[in-house]
Protein backbone atom coordinates (compact mmCIF):
# COMPACT_ATOMS: atom_id res chain seq x y z
CA UNK A 1 0.00 0.00 0.00
CA UNK A 2 2.85 2.40 0.86
CA UNK A 3 4.46 1.75 -2.51
CA UNK A 4 1.25 2.58 -4.32
CA UNK A 5 0.70 5.76 -2.31
CA UNK A 6 4.30 6.87 -2.93
CA UNK A 7 3.78 6.38 -6.66
CA UNK A 8 0.54 8.36 -6.62
CA UNK A 9 2.24 11.07 -4.58
CA UNK A 10 4.95 11.40 -7.24
CA UNK A 11 2.30 11.57 -9.95
CA UNK A 12 0.45 14.23 -7.96
CA UNK A 13 3.68 16.27 -7.76
CA UNK A 14 3.69 16.25 -11.56
CA UNK A 15 0.15 17.58 -11.65
CA UNK A 16 1.01 20.35 -9.18
CA UNK A 17 4.14 21.28 -11.14
CA UNK A 18 2.05 21.64 -14.31
CA UNK A 19 -0.40 23.93 -12.57
CA UNK A 20 2.38 26.17 -11.23
CA UNK A 21 4.43 26.55 -14.40
CA UNK A 22 3.80 26.90 -18.11
CA UNK A 23 5.91 25.33 -20.83
CA UNK A 24 8.80 24.38 -18.51
CA UNK A 25 6.34 22.87 -16.05
CA UNK A 26 4.75 20.79 -18.76
CA UNK A 27 7.95 18.87 -19.46
CA UNK A 28 8.71 18.51 -15.75
CA UNK A 29 5.17 17.37 -15.03
CA UNK A 30 5.33 14.75 -17.77
CA UNK A 31 8.53 13.36 -16.31
CA UNK A 32 7.24 13.28 -12.74
CA UNK A 33 3.90 11.81 -13.76
CA UNK A 34 5.65 9.10 -15.76
CA UNK A 35 8.03 8.46 -12.86
CA UNK A 36 5.15 8.03 -10.43
CA UNK A 37 3.19 5.73 -12.69
CA UNK A 38 6.26 3.64 -13.50
CA UNK A 39 7.05 3.38 -9.79
CA UNK A 40 3.59 1.93 -9.17
CA UNK A 41 3.91 -0.27 -12.25
CA UNK A 42 7.24 -1.71 -11.17
CA UNK A 43 5.70 -2.76 -7.88
CA UNK A 44 2.53 -4.36 -9.25
CA UNK A 45 2.01 -7.79 -10.71
CA UNK A 46 4.20 -8.63 -13.70
CA UNK A 47 1.37 -8.71 -16.24
CA UNK A 48 0.28 -5.19 -15.31
CA UNK A 49 3.69 -3.54 -15.69
CA UNK A 50 3.43 -3.39 -19.48
CA UNK A 51 0.01 -1.73 -19.26
CA UNK A 52 1.18 0.88 -16.76
CA UNK A 53 4.28 1.61 -18.84
CA UNK A 54 2.07 2.11 -21.89
CA UNK A 55 -0.16 4.53 -19.96
CA UNK A 56 2.91 6.48 -18.84
CA UNK A 57 4.30 6.68 -22.36
CA UNK A 58 0.96 7.86 -23.76
CA UNK A 59 0.79 10.53 -21.05
CA UNK A 60 4.26 11.75 -21.95
CA UNK A 61 3.29 11.87 -25.64
CA UNK A 62 0.10 13.79 -24.89
CA UNK A 63 1.90 16.30 -22.67
CA UNK A 64 4.55 16.78 -25.36
CA UNK A 65 1.80 17.50 -27.89
CA UNK A 66 0.31 20.13 -25.61
CA UNK A 67 3.58 22.08 -25.44
CA UNK A 68 2.83 25.57 -24.23
CA UNK A 69 -0.96 25.21 -24.33
CA UNK A 70 -3.38 25.70 -21.47
CA UNK A 71 -2.21 24.02 -18.27
CA UNK A 72 -5.73 22.79 -17.52
CA UNK A 73 -5.43 20.29 -20.37
CA UNK A 74 -2.13 19.00 -18.98
CA UNK A 75 -3.62 18.67 -15.53
CA UNK A 76 -6.51 16.64 -16.93
CA UNK A 77 -4.11 14.31 -18.80
CA UNK A 78 -1.99 13.77 -15.70
CA UNK A 79 -5.05 13.26 -13.51
CA UNK A 80 -6.41 10.63 -15.90
CA UNK A 81 -3.05 8.84 -15.72
CA UNK A 82 -3.15 8.79 -11.92
CA UNK A 83 -6.73 7.51 -12.00
CA UNK A 84 -5.73 4.82 -14.50
CA UNK A 85 -2.86 3.68 -12.30
CA UNK A 86 -5.23 3.55 -9.34
CA UNK A 87 -7.72 1.48 -11.30
CA UNK A 88 -4.97 -0.94 -12.35
CA UNK A 89 -3.79 -1.30 -8.76
CA UNK A 90 -7.36 -1.87 -7.56
CA UNK A 91 -7.99 -4.44 -10.30
CA UNK A 92 -4.89 -6.42 -9.30
CA UNK A 93 -5.89 -6.38 -5.64
CA UNK A 94 -2.91 -4.23 -4.63
CA UNK A 95 -5.28 -1.74 -2.99
CA UNK A 96 -9.00 -1.54 -2.41
CA UNK A 97 -11.17 0.99 -4.24
CA UNK A 98 -12.41 2.44 -0.95
CA UNK A 99 -8.79 3.18 -0.01
CA UNK A 100 -8.39 5.16 -3.23
CA UNK A 101 -11.53 7.14 -2.41
CA UNK A 102 -10.12 7.89 1.04
CA UNK A 103 -6.92 9.22 -0.54
CA UNK A 104 -8.96 11.54 -2.75
CA UNK A 105 -10.55 12.97 0.39
CA UNK A 106 -7.09 13.57 1.85
CA UNK A 107 -5.83 15.80 -0.92
CA UNK A 108 -5.53 14.04 -4.24
CA UNK A 109 -7.24 15.91 -7.05
CA UNK A 110 -10.84 14.99 -7.67
CA UNK A 111 -11.90 14.17 -11.21
CA UNK A 112 -13.40 17.24 -12.85
CA UNK A 113 -11.96 19.71 -10.34
CA UNK A 114 -8.91 21.99 -10.42
CA UNK A 115 -6.76 21.60 -7.27
CA UNK A 116 -9.86 20.85 -5.19
CA UNK A 117 -10.94 24.49 -5.50
CA UNK A 118 -14.36 23.51 -6.75
CA UNK A 119 -13.64 25.01 -10.17
CA UNK A 120 -15.05 22.54 -12.66
CA UNK A 121 -13.09 21.44 -15.70
CA UNK A 122 -13.95 19.19 -18.59
CA UNK A 123 -11.32 16.37 -18.45
CA UNK A 124 -12.11 15.44 -22.04
CA UNK A 125 -11.65 19.02 -23.25
CA UNK A 126 -9.09 19.42 -25.98
CA UNK A 127 -7.20 22.53 -24.92
CA UNK A 128 -5.49 22.94 -28.26
CA UNK A 129 -6.14 22.44 -31.92
CA UNK A 130 -3.64 21.70 -34.65
CA UNK A 131 -3.98 23.98 -37.69
CA UNK A 132 -4.66 22.32 -41.04
CA UNK A 133 -1.54 21.23 -42.88
CA UNK A 134 -2.07 23.67 -45.74
CA UNK A 135 -1.32 26.54 -43.35
CA UNK A 136 2.25 25.30 -42.86
CA UNK A 137 5.00 26.61 -45.12
CA UNK A 138 8.44 25.19 -45.62
CA UNK A 139 11.17 27.57 -44.59
CA UNK A 140 14.40 27.70 -46.50
CA UNK A 141 17.05 30.09 -45.19
CA UNK A 142 18.60 32.51 -47.61
CA UNK A 143 22.17 31.73 -48.58
From Swiss-Prot:
Compartment list: Cytoplasm, Cytosol; Membrane; Nucleus; Synapse
Tissue expression per record: Brain.
SUPFAM superfamilies in alphabetical order: Synuclein
Keywords, sorted A to Z: Acetylation, Copper, Cytoplasm, Membrane, Metal-binding, Nucleus, Repeat, Secreted, Synapse
Acidic residues bias: start-end ranges: 123-143
GO MF term list: actin binding; alpha-tubulin binding; arachidonate binding; calcium ion binding; copper ion binding; cuprous ion binding; cysteine-type endopeptidase inhibitor activity; dynein complex binding
Post-translational modification as stated in the protein's UniProt record: Acetylation at Met-1 seems to be important for proper folding and native oligomeric structure.
Chain spans, region Disordered: 116-143
GO cellular component terms given for this protein: actin cytoskeleton; axon terminus; cell cortex; cytosol; extracellular space; growth cone; inclusion body; mitochondrion
Binding locations of Cu cation: 2, 50
Sequence repeat spans: 20-30, 31-41, 42-56, 57-67
InterPro entries, A to Z: Synuclein (IPR001058), Synuclein_alpha (IPR002460)
Residues the record lists as N-acetylmethionine modifications: 1
Presence of keyword Acetylation: yes
Chief localisation class: cytoplasm
GO biological process, one term: regulation of glutamate secretion
A UniProt-annotated Pfam family: Synuclein
Segments of this protein annotated with the region 4 X 11 AA tandem repeats of [EGS]-K-T-K-[EQ]-[GQ]-V-X(4): 20-67
Function: May be involved in the regulation of dopamine release and transport.
PANTHER family: ALPHA-SYNUCLEIN, SYNUCLEIN
Protein family membership: Belongs to the synuclein family.
Protein's name according to its UniProt entry: Alpha-synuclein
Amino acid sequence: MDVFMKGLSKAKEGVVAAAEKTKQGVAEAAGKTKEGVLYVGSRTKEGVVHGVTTVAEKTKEQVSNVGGAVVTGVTAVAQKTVEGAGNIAAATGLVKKDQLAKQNEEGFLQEGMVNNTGAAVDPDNEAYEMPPEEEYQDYEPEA
